[in-house]
Amino acid sequence: MADESETAVKPPAPPLPQMMEGNGNGHEHCSDCENEEDNSYNRGGLSPANDTGAKKKKKKQKKKKEKGSETDSAQDQPVKMNSLPAERIQEIQKAIELFSVGQGPAKTMEEASKRSYQFWDTQPVPKLGEVVNTHGPVEPDKDNIRQEPYTLPQGFTWDALDLGDRGVLKELYTLLNENYVEDDDNMFRFDYSPEFLLWALRPPGWLPQWHCGVRVVSSRKLVGFISAIPANIHIYDTEKKMVEINFLCVHKKLRSKRVAPVLIREITRRVHLEGIFQAVYTAGVVLPKPVGTCRYWHRSLNPRKLIEVKFSHLSRNMTMQRTMKLYRLPETPKTAGLRPMETKDIPVVHQLLTRYLKQFHLTPVMSQEEVEHWFYPQENIIDTFVVENANGEVTDFLSFYTLPSTIMNHPTHKSLKAAYSFYNVHTQTPLLDLMSDALVLAKMKGFDVFNALDLMENKTFLEKLKFGIGDGNLQYYLYNWKCPSMGAEKVGLVLQ
């Protein structure tokens, strides 16, 4: 953890879910459909971070005591209004809506234990308080799958997005850039580049029907999106074909139309049509039922800028000069033989990754083709560096992907460039040295902050390399699969 001599780093808020919905037909990167108004779906964390040496922020508001069970939205609250004047009815409706939105999604198990989950109670997932000791599907695979698309609200239509069309790709970029994940203080918003979206959405095995858009019939404007990508997942002793669902996004002006649940039902249906009935997804909120919980940590690379944009703040008794000195890094990496990954390295990187991941309980199982897709360097998307020894053997590698955030309402700075730790495999080079070099490389490439989850072996280097702990958790979930929960150190899966 950071000590009081360090800056307090605002951590990116963890990924919110994009969820599955509809009669067990679905897969996701989960969304909190229990709270339709809170329709932002986090991937990598946007909120500024805490650290132990700085005074923690006071919570914006104390929660109001709630009577009875909670409801999913204002629309679900029955209120007798027949005899009230129109103005009074409007006031009551606004109050109900504000109360519902103000509750927000549960960020902790304690908060979640006080909620009712009317949507998730209908899905093949374990209940929050359930103790799971078995392994296997919650319900059997379905034989009878709906053939027709789900019905959208009047005036909207489905459209499978052709991301090979630059114009369509730009439309998706614009939708996400203007309506996707923001931090709790509305200071930062993820800025997925068009090239990043192609990397994230078109891995080997991608299907065009899984790039599921919603358009306005009259104007053809893109106002909603959800996606699925295939993934082979190893969970304890079982390997399953699953999907990851991501980028659930609904235009801000349509969030009262209940479009998100229909998107989730529809992507679920389309995935089931391909014979896939399990999913893995992550969420920054607590839903039934996490299989693992991780925390984001953040390492300042450009502390002056991070402080100026209020991503971080000066810890007490610290000056800007002392802070910059604290986070200063070497000019160049120190590991001999460290170089960018090349095409010839793909087989050995695949081999190293496969062998390394065997020690964890939740991991991807990648083909050589998938390793090429996810790890071969692409500028401003993915960086991978290998360590080649004196005998010409590749013994280790490090990797991080690029996900900037737009800085909103700042007179000088417009973008925050963040690196996210991906997979780091060591056999000869100490992991601490490998990750120290990762920080140096990220700094050389102009990144402002380096983010990492405390999964796999990451806890062994986070404090030593002056990472500050974030202020939110990232939950991992499995859809239609029961298994015991695991500690963060046994999670070996990183989702973009």
From Swiss-Prot:
Tetradecanoyl-CoA binds at Q118, F119, W120, F247, L248, C249, V250, S256, R258, V259, A260. Residues 1-82 are annotated as: Disordered. It is found in: Cytoplasm; Cytoplasm, Cytosol; Membrane. Its main location: cytoplasm. Residues 55-66 have a biased composition (Basic residues). Its EC number is 2.3.1.97, 2.3.1.-. It comes from the Eukaryota. Transmembrane segments: none annotated. It is an enzyme of class 2 (transferase). GO terms for biological process: in utero embryonic development; ketone metabolic process; N-terminal peptidyl-glycine N-myristoylation; positive regulation of establishment of protein localization to mitochondrion; protein localization to membrane; regulation of opsin-mediated signaling pathway. GO terms for cellular component: cytoplasm; cytosol; plasma membrane. Heart, gut, kidney, liver and placenta. Keywords: Acyltransferase, Cytoplasm, Membrane, Phosphoprotein, Transferase. The keyword Acyltransferase applies. Belongs to the NMT family. This is Glycylpeptide N-tetradecanoyltransferase 1.
